[in-house]
């Protein structure tokens, strides 16, 4: 049975844990905060294959855990990078995260690189407060070779289910190639840049 590891990344308050809990339980949690590391596990059947899924939200760790983000990027088979469409700063953070992942995966094959990152604009139900146009998200995803979704964890269970199912499928296809190669360790300068991006975050919603 294959183990698939997916990291869910993004700024504080963009709805990372809400998306995960919605996927796992169908329930929507409007406010969520944790001072401890959160790893969610689920057994799935994808294309008649049994998979053990681990969903990791490193943003739920305490402040001193942010230095492990570099390790999480190497650890994961797939990435869900989330921003809030009503918060432009969260979009800029998501853009920085995507670029960091790409820098660390320069040696990846194009197929694996294309399928591993999903850029998700959350809180579509707040479109009346929109600060990030859908076209901006699509443009970033296209330029960075990401899959793109814009949805609402509060209102769109089926879209959340589809998004997670698709990234698990894509990550499972890429994980065999990943096992055959040794990823290079992140540089100190890259780790410092990650810390600069995430230095002010404390809790995840």
From Swiss-Prot:
Residues annotated for GTP binding in this entry: 10-17, 57-63, 122-125
Its EC number is 3.6.5.2
Molecular function via GO: G protein activity; GTP binding
Which stretches does the entry tag as region Small GTPase-like?
1-205
The text of the family note is: Belongs to the small GTPase superfamily. Ras family.
**Catalytic activity entry:** GTP + H2O = GDP + phosphate + H(+)
Identify the InterPro entries for this entry: P-loop_NTPase, Ras-related_GTPase, Small_GTPase
Supply the enzyme class, top level. hydrolase
Spell out the PROSITE patterns in the cross-references.
RAS
Q: What is this protein called?
A: Ras-related and estrogen-regulated growth inhibitor-like protein
Keywords of the record: GTP-binding, Hydrolase, Nucleotide-binding
What Gene3D superfamilies would the database entry show? P-loop containing nucleotide triphosphate hydrolases
* Summary of the function given for this chain in its UniProt record: Binds GDP/GTP and may possess intrinsic GTPase activity.
């Amino acid at each position: 049975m294959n183990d698939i590891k997916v990291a869910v990344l993004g700024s504080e308050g963009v709805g990372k844990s809400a998306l995960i809990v919605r996927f796992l339980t169908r329930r929507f949690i409007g406010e969520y905060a944790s001072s401890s590391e959160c790893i969610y596990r689920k057994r799935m059947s994808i294309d008649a294959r049994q998979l053990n899924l681990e969903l990791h939200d490193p943003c739920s760790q305490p402040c001193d855990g942010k230095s492990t983000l570099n390790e999480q990027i190497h650890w994961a088979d797939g990435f869900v990078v989330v921003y809030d469409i009503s918060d432009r700063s969260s979009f800029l953070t998501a853009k920085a995260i995507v670029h960091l992942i790409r820098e660390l995966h320069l040696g990846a094959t194009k197929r694996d690189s294309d399928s591993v990152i999903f850029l998700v604009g959350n809180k579509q139900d707040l479109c009346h407060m929109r600060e990030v146009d859908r076209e901006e998200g699509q443009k970033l995803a296209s330029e960075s070779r990401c899959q793109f979704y814009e949805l609402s964890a509060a209102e769109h269970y089926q879209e959340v289910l589809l998004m997670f199912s698709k990234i698990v499928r894509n990550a499972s296809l890429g994980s065999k190639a990943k096992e055959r190669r040794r990823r290079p360790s992140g540089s100190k300068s890259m780790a410092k840049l990650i810390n600069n991006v995430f230095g002010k975050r404390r809790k995840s919603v």
